């Protein structure tokens, strides 16, 4: 199969879809025509020469990379890339379609095969291609929150873990999944007073077994969220409903109840965010804004700030699926691997992921009707 790897052009997105090691795996499987856009790996400290040595057939400009049968990317395409779409093209990347009507319509109009990393789902409910970036984003969220609590960044001027004679500060993590758990790990490591809120009693028990007395757990309901947010210095939003818009769990009134200089980090912003005051997506160039005295961090591609780590972690997880698609074609690969089939969000001009269709009020077609 002819495979293209374009350079990411989203603001400060320094990741690349495949490491040179991943390219070796593809070329050894017989997929020798890999079009790597010139400079695509530089942000992750991979040189063009490394890709050529790994077996990439040639380096190219973006248009040529996009002209291949399967496109491997990291982030969802931006508007300037929609013109590269064509019927039957396979796009394998993070899509996050629920809040992105224009991209969704472009995939429908061009009849692109849109396979989203974030909705590839194993039988046990886990999301293997979202997990590595959730780990990164979760760990970053607490680090970033601690930074913006510093006075010179607009925060209260406090240290999360306190020091001798000064009490630790309060961190609330809403969502106890992969991202939330990793945010809590870093907060505990910093010595903060940590609360994790989740909807699942079973998950809360798992977190208590994991953290012991280092973390307090609470059931997710409006009262518990309001009380915990009110008394928190840092709130991390880490709720995920696969493929769907994030629920608005923290109201504007809750944000107003926080002390000035408090910080919220919305990991879920790429799905619309969980804070009612998350009314914009920010960038690494301009990552925060202040509303009701609270610093809001709403960067949708957080792992792009640590691209070397993120690219390696992403490739480790995506390469088995990319190989299945390249070796068998997407239809047979999806028939053989139900987890991969759940990643198909757009196919033959239809939306085939129910949560996306519901979020945008579009007709839903079961993917099984199109892949047999």
UniProtKB/Swiss-Prot annotation:
Gene3D superfamilies: NAD(P)-binding Rossmann-like Domain. It is found in: Cytoplasm. One of its GO terms (molecular function) is nucleotide binding. Its EC number is 1.4.1.1. It holds the Pfam family AlaDh_PNT_N. It comes from the Bacteria. The active site is at residues 96, 270. PROSITE patterns: ALADH_PNT_1, ALADH_PNT_2. Optimum pH is 10.0-10.5 for the oxidative deamination of L-alanine and about 9.0 for reductive amination of pyruvate. GO terms for biological process: alanine catabolic process; L-alanine catabolic process; sporulation resulting in formation of a cellular spore. Keywords: Cytoplasm, NAD, Nucleotide-binding, Oxidoreductase, Sporulation. It catalyses: L-alanine + NAD(+) + H2O = pyruvate + NH4(+) + NADH + H(+). It is an enzyme of class 1 (oxidoreductase). NAD(+) binds at residues 134, 178-179, 198, 220, 239-240, 267-270, 280, 299-302. InterPro entries: Ala_DH (IPR008141), Ala_DH/PNT_CS2 (IPR008143), AlaDH/PNT_CS1 (IPR008142), AlaDH/PNT_N (IPR007886), AlaDH/PNT_NAD(H)-bd (IPR007698), NAD(P)-bd_dom_sf (IPR036291). One of its GO terms (cellular component) is cytosol. Pathway: Amino-acid degradation; L-alanine degradation via dehydrogenase pathway; NH(3) and pyruvate from L-alanine: step 1/1. Loses about 50% of its initial activity when heated at 65 degrees Celsius for 5 minutes. PANTHER family: ALANINE DEHYDROGENASE. Catalyzes the reversible reductive amination of pyruvate to L-alanine. Prefers L-alanine for oxidative deamination, other substrates are poorly reactive. In the other direction 2-oxobutyrate is almost as reactive as pyruvate. Ammonia is the sole amino donor for the reductive amination of pyruvate, NADPH is inert. Reductive amination proceeds through a sequential, ordered ternary-binary mechanism, where NADH binds first followed by ammonia and pyruvate; the products are released in the order L-alanine and NAD(+). Belongs to the AlaDH/PNT family. This is Alanine dehydrogenase. The gene is ald.
């Amino acid at each position: 199969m002819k495979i293209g790897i374009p350079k990411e052009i989203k603001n400060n997105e320094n990741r690349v879809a495949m490491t040179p090691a991943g390219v070796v795996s593809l070329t050894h499987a017989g997929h020798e025509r890999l079009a790597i856009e010139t400079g695509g790996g530089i942000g992750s400290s991979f040189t063009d020469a490394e890709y050529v040595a790994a077996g990439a057939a040639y380096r190219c400009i973006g248009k040529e990379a996009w002209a291949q049968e399967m496109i491997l990317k990291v982030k969802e395409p931006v508007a300037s890339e929609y013109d590269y779409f064509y019927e039957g093209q396979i796009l394998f990347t993070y899509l996050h379609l629920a809040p992105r009507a224009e991209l969704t319509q472009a995939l429908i109009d061009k009849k692109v095969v849109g396979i989203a990393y974030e909705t590839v789902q194993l039988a046990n409910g886990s999301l293997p291609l979202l997990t590595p970036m959730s780990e990164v984003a979760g760990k970053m969220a607490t680090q970033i929150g601690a930074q913006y609590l510093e006075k010179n960044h607009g925060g209260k001027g406090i240290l999360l873990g306190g020091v001798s004679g000064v009490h630790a500060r309060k961190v609330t993590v809403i969502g106890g999944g992969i991202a939330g758990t990793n945010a809590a790990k870093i907060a505990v490591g910093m010595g903060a007073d940590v609360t994790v809120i989740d909807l699942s009693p079973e998950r809360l028990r798992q977190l208590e077994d994991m953290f012991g007395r280092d973390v307090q757990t609470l059931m997710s309901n409006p009262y518990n969220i309001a009380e915990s947010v009110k008394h928190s210095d840092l709130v991390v939003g880490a709720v995920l409903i696969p493929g769907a818009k994030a629920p608005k769990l923290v109201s504007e009134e809750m944000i107003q109840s926080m002390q000035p200089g408090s910080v919220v980090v919305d990991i879920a912003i790429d799905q619309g965010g969980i804070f009612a005051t998350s009314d914009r997506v920010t960038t690494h160039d301009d990552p925060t804004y202040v509303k009701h005295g609270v610093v809001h961090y709403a960067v949708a591609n957080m792992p792009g700030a640590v691209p070397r780590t993120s690219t390696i972690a992403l490739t480790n997880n995506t390469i088995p699926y990319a190989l299945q698609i390249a070796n068998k074609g997407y239809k047979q690969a999806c028939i053989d691997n139900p987890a991969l089939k759940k990643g198909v969000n757009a196919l033959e001009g239809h939306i085939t992921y129910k949560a996306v269709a519901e979020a945008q009020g579009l007709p839903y077609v079961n993917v099984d009707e199109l892949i047999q």
